[in-house]
């Protein structure tokens, strides 16, 4: 049936901040849906709280609201915009939950808003564990025996009936949050208590265990005509019992028989029809010896559908959006081939592997075990002609400096350690399989211990055989076969005892070069018009390089802490800029979740690891005019110097555009940067460099404790710490010296209680455009990526702001920056200190762009390609009459055992933005978006160190005046009462009940303010902070943030929150000419 004429305006709900379990895949699907609806002439209103997304760009939708994703706020947007319909299945679990709540509240009915695509009833049947089970039984599809419970007593009863182990699955949660595998009665009670709390409807399903069965997923699509197609089938290398988002996944299925594959395909189609889902949907099965169980259905676009889209080239979100407004599969054109309809099932003639990227390098103390709830932050995808090739490419895409054969880290493992690692799934299991094979374990033994199919273990055995052959010397035949299997020249060089350059030159002299194949949805049966390629060492090459002026942009790889979706945002903007200038733009990247790897984002996409060899291979083929490294985060910046060297070595004319690699090195290399600042006469904190533990002690003593220590060249403050005394320094040196290979340790004076400042600017070598000056709410010493910050600054005097601008201009011009620069400063006792400069895109670029209405990344890309700021009329300075606040989302609730204290190591996974006409309301909105709802009534618990008591008394008085009640520990409550602030005393944890934990567990405490001191109180505080996370109570660990919270609560009690679209705010920006 043709598209509906009554649907003229549609509301799309985004998925909010990047968090574990819900990453960039929803920006990718949301952006695709926006384009798809607007192609059909439908007006799109978008609401999302995450500024770092492409979908919240003003030109992606007709109206963009960056507001908290809570039903009350979305209801106000509906009241204002009056959309005809709402699409729930694009914004992940957040979008589904909000749509369900709006329906329950009667808002949709009141304003006549129809749920388009998958209906609320279908969402409920798929998400409510009990309804889902009944629906499956009704159509005769086998499900594991299970019982849905809503209390711990019911869980005890269910356990008696089903036995242990049990899988606990909460209803309506994200990434398996709150669930797990219970092997004992105690574990069951603990997991059920968390799960019931996390579930929106206070329900969990206890399910008989199918741990060890093969996990298989089908991505299916259905339209209103009841036409169904399967887009892709995927097999998890890891068996059941691990969340599919935590598993290594391969498509097509490798180990099932043709009969089993067809049986599951029929079941998948049967299920999507029975549930009445319209659009894309993901169905998970457990399979063993020819029988199967249906595990769950996601009635929405998901992480797996992003993977399926990228693996096959079939644009699931685009088609889902068109189905939602009434089109059918045979009416929708396949945009990749331009000639086949969307009702043709895609076929693949290659192997695709996805590996998750975990944050354990940042959370050394967190539990690494993988279960049914997610811990990974992102993922990589690789394409090859064989399983081995795809696996090798995927491992190097992870950017963890380790490949299968890397032994350094694993030498100390004993055989018993290896057995334990095979038995317990962790992020290291793949490497444990390699180690076990190297140590002579049989394939059967490894398979029995790990429950992983022998097929996958044999593929790793093949890689080991190839390594052993190479150790016998390099011959043309061996080199050719090793390259076919996915080996890098650098790895081959290690095995044969040559340098990487020698292997590369020998390979090129033999004419062994990669060919590029196209991903075209149809195994080359039809011509594809969207060029999307992967490399392999095969005979025929499908790549036809053009003679146009063209640029290669390096992407940022998998989402991880410290390198998030912000860099993908910048990559996409760079493409737009180049296209506007008539330059062909190509991307190399390997993250299946992002907009940059969408089939129609760039002129050509290379789905490849971002390593020196893989990038050079593409450059050799395409002969670019230039390469851009500024937008791909540290991954790309780290390649700048080696890439320039290799281009010169091979005599290629391609240049690195923008700031020169030498200038990047000056900014990254501490000694060179210090010299530059001294020459410019710009103050910096006292600092020194140490190459040994003894030297470190001497330097720290000269500077005076506390000091900030870190290795040189890092991203996201990895292995950075504030050290208060010599014993702390000794411990750090033991831990950190491992981090820096030939790089020394940097030691800085730690500026206590300074105000931290962040500036994003674009320079063309003559003029400097300052996008914004951000004032941090947390004091210096907390990583800038973890700090809340505000535009414009709220407490800095005018003369300080003038100094900041002056320093930014002088540093940018001295470094001859062409493109973006981010500079971090600290203000203390009347002096502005420069902490660091990064001549690359920063994680605040999207936030600044949304706040002031200037697309900085796009402007920077044009400057790098030769435009000047004056030519673009951008020799200006923006001034805004409102306040924008950026707040971060921390992953602690998904990582049991990690402490929630912030420090110089970056911990956050994503960000949100609050925007209103004063700092209080903007901060209130930002906290609401970050799931830290500030209370307007109830109890506030305060426990602070002595030096904070004077400041906190004033904050506490403001809370009491706002009608909140205060409880505090001994010292703090005494001090508050002495200052005339009423406060009730509660016991410290180790003094028995009633203590603060009892209040938290009873749900009476609505806000916790706890600044830590000594190690004992850090531990005591750890218990308080940890239970705050577990019971979802907002907590604050700095005095500055407590002040901001007080102001926010006062303003929210007095004033109305403004609900306005981004373009309405941007119209109020004034530009001052310079």
From Swiss-Prot:
Which Pfam families does this entry report, sorted A to Z? Answer: CPSase_L_D2 (PF02786), CPSase_L_D3 (PF02787), MGS (PF02142)
Gene Ontology, cellular component aspect = cytoplasm
Q: Where is this region: Carbamoyl phosphate synthetic domain?
A: 544-933
Spell out the residue ranges making up region: Allosteric domain.
934-1074
According to the entry, every stretch annotated as the ATP-grasp domain falls at: 133-325, 674-865
The cofactors it requires, by name, are: Mg(2+); Mn(2+)
Region spans: Oligomerization domain: 400-543
Q: Which reaction does this chain catalyze?
A: hydrogencarbonate + L-glutamine + 2 ATP + H2O = carbamoyl phosphate + L-glutamate + 2 ADP + phosphate + 2 H(+)
Q: Which UniProt keywords apply?
A: Amino-acid biosynthesis, Arginine biosynthesis, ATP-binding, Ligase, Magnesium, Manganese, Metal-binding, Nucleotide-binding, Pyrimidine biosynthesis, Repeat
User: Where does this protein hold Mg(2+) 2?
Assistant: 296, 298
* Coiled-coil intervals, chain numbering: none
UniProt-annotated binding residues for ATP 2: 710, 749, 751, 756, 781-784, 824, 836
**Residue sites binding Mn(2+) 1 per the record:** 284, 296
Could you name the domain of life of the organism this protein comes from?
Answer: Archaea
Q: What pathway does the UniProt record associate with this protein?
A: Amino-acid biosynthesis; L-arginine biosynthesis; carbamoyl phosphate from bicarbonate: step 1/1; Pyrimidine metabolism; UMP biosynthesis via de novo pathway; (S)-dihydroorotate from bicarbonate: step 1/3
Renumbered residue ranges of the record's region Carboxyphosphate synthetic domain:
1-399
Q: Which residues bind ATP 1?
A: 129, 169, 175-176, 208, 210, 215, 241-243, 284, 296
Query: Which function does this protein serve?
Result: Large subunit of the glutamine-dependent carbamoyl phosphate synthetase (CPSase). CPSase catalyzes the formation of carbamoyl phosphate from the ammonia moiety of glutamine, carbonate, and phosphate donated by ATP, constituting the first step of 2 biosynthetic pathways, one leading to arginine and/or urea and the other to pyrimidine nucleotides.
Q: What is this protein called?
A: Carbamoyl phosphate synthase large chain
């Amino acid at each position: 049936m043709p598209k509906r004429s009554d649907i003229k305006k549609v509301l799309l709900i985004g998925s909010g901040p990047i968090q574990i379990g819900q990453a960039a895949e929803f920006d990718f699907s949301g952006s695709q849906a926006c384009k798809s609806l607007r192609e059909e002439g439908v007006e799109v209103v978008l609401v999302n709280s995450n500024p770092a997304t492409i979908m919240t760009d003003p030109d992606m939708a007709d109206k963009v609201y960056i507001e908290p994703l809570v039903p009350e706020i979305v209801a106000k947007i509906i009241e204002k915009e009056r959309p005809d319909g709402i699409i729930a299945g694009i914004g992940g679990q957040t979008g589904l939950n909000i749509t369900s709540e709006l329906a329950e509240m009667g808002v949709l009915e009141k304003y006549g808003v129809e749920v388009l695509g998958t209906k609320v009833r279908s969402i409920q049947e798929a998400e409510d564990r009990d309804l889902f089970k009944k629906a499956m039984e009704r159509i005769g599809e086998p499900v594991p025996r299970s019982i849905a419970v809503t209390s711990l007593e019911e869980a005890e009863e269910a356990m008696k009936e089903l036995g242990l182990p049990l899988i606990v699955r909460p209803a309506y949660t994200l990434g398996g949050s709150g669930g797990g595998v219970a092997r004992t009665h105690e574990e069951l009670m603990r997991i059920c208590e968390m799960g019931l709390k996390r579930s929106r409807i206070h329900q969990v399903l206890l399910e008989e265990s199918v741990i060890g069965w093969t996990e298989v997923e089908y991505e299916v699509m259905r339209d209103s005509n009841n036409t169904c197609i399967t887009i892709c089938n995927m097999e998890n290398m890891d068996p059941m019992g691990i969340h599919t988002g935590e598993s290594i996944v391969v498509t097509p299925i490798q180990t099932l028989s043709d009969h089993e594959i067809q049986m599951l395909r029929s079941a998948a189609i049967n299920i999507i029809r029975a549930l009445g889902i319209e659009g894309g949907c993901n169905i998970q099965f457990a399979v063993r010896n020819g029988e199967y169980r249906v595990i769950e259905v996601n009635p929405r676009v998901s992480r797996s559908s992003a993977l399926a889209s990228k693996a096959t080239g079939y644009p699931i979100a685009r088609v889902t959006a068109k189905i939602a407004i009434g089109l059918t599969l045979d009416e929708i054109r396949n945009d990749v081939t331009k000639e086949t309809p969307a009702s043709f099932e895609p076929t693949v003639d290659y192997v695709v592997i996805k590996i998750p990227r975990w944050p354990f390098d940042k959370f050394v103390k967190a539990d690494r075990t993988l279960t049914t709830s997610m811990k990974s932050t992102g993922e990589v995808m690789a394409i090859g002609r064989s399983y081995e090739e795809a696996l090798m490419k995927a491992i190097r895409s992870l950017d963890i400096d380790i490949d299968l054969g890397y032994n350094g880290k694993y030498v100390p493992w004993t055989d018993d350690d290896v057995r334990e690692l095979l038995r317990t799934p962790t992020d290291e299991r793949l490497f444990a399989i390699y180690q076990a094979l190297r140590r002579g374990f049989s394939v059967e033994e490894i398979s029995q211990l790990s429950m992983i199919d022998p097929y996958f273990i044999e593929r790793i055995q093949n890689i080991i055989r190839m390594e052993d052959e190479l150790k016998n010397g390099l011959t043309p035949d061996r080199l050719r076969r090793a390259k076919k299997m996915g080996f890098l020249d650098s790895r081959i060089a290690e095995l044969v005892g040559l340098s990487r350059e020698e292997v590369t030159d020998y390979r090129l002299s033999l004419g062994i070069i990669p060919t590029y194949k196209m991903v075209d949805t149809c195994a080359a049966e039809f011509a594809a018009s969207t060029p999307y390629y992967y490399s392999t060492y095969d005979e025929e090459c499908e790549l036809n390089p053009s003679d146009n002026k063209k640029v290669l942009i390096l992407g940022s790889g998998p989402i991880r802490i410290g390198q998030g979706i912000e860099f993908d945002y910048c990559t996409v903007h760079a493409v737009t800029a180049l296209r506007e200038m008539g330059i062909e733009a190509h991307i190399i990247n390997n993250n299946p979740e992002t907009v940059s790897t969408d089939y129609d984002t760039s002129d050509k996409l290379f789905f490849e690891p971002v390593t020196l060899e893989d990038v050079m291979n593409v450059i050799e083929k395409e002969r670019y005019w230039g390469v851009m490294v500024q937008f791909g985060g540290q991954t790309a910046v780290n390649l700048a110097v080696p890439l320039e060297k290799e281009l010169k070595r091979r005599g290629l004319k391609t240049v690195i555009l923008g700031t020169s690699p030498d200038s990047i090195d000056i900014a990254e290399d501490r000694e060179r940067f210090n010299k530059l600042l001294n020459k410019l006469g710009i103050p910096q904190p006292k600092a020194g460099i140490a190459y040994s533990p003894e030297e470190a002690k001497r330097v720290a003593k000269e500077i005076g404790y506390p000091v900030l220590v870190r290795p040189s060249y890092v991203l996201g403050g990895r292995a950075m710490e504030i050290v208060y005394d010599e014993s702390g320094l000794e411990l750090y040196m033991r831990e950190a010296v491992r981090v820096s290979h030939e790089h020394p340790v940097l030691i800085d004076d730690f500026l206590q209680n300074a105000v931290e400042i962040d500036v994003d600017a674009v320079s063309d070598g003559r003029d400097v455009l300052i996008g914004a000056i951000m004032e941090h709410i947390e004091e210096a010493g907390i990583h800038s990526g973890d700090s809340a910050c505000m535009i414009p600054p709220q407490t800095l005097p005018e003369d300080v702001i003038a100094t900041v601008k002056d320093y930014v201009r002088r540093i940018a011009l001295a470094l001859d920056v062409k493109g973006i620069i981010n500079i971090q400063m600290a203000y203390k006792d009347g002096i502005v200190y420069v902490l660091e400069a990064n001549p690359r895109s920063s994680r605040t670029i999207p936030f600044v762009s949304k706040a002031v209405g200037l697309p900085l990344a796009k402007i920077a890309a044009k400057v790098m390609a030769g435009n000047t700021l004056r030519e673009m009329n951008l020799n200006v300075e923006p001034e805004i009459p409102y306040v924008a606040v950026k707040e971060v989302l921390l992953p602690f609730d998904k990582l049991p055992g990690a402490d929630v204290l912030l420090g110089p190591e970056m911990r956050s996974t994503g960000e949100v933005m609050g925007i209103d006409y004063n700092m209080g309301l903007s901060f209130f909105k930002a906290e609401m978006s970050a799931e830290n709802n500030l209370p307007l009534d109830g109890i506030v618990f305060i426990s602070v160190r002595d030096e904070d008591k004077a400041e906190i008394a004033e904050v506490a008085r403001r809370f009491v005046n706002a009608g909140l009640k205060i409880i505090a520990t001994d010292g703090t409550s005494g001090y508050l009462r002495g200052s005339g602030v009423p406060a009730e005393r509660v016991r410290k944890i180790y003094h028995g009940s009633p203590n603060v934990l009892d209040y938290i567990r009873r749900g009476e405490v609505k806000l916790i303010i706890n600044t830590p001191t000594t190690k004992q109180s850090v531990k005591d505080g750890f218990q308080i902070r940890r239970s705050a996370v577990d019971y979802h109570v907002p907590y604050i660990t700095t005095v500055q943030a407590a002040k901001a919270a007080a102001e926010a609560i006062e303003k929210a009690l007095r004033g109305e929150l403004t609900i306005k679209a981004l373009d309405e705010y941007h119209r109020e920006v004034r530009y001052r000419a310079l």
